Amino acid sequence: SVDFDSESPR
């Protein structure tokens, strides 16, 4: 929920 795609798998 922060950074660019930190909560994304890759």
UniProtKB/Swiss-Prot annotation:
User: What job does this protein perform?
Assistant: Blocks contraction of smooth muscle elicited by high potassium-induced depolarization, but does not block caffeine-stimulated contraction. May target voltage-gated calcium channels on smooth muscle.
What compartments host this protein? Secreted
List UniProt keywords, sorted A-Z: Calcium channel impairing toxin, Disulfide bond, Ion channel impairing toxin, Neurotoxin, Secreted, Toxin
Domain of life according to the entry: Eukaryota
How is this protein named in the record?
Cysteine-rich venom protein
Regarding how it is modified after translation, the entry says: Contains 8 disulfide bonds.
Tissue note: Expressed by the venom gland.
GO MF terms listed in the record are: calcium channel regulator activity; toxin activity
- Tell me its family: Belongs to the CRISP family.
Give the CC-aspect GO terms.
extracellular region
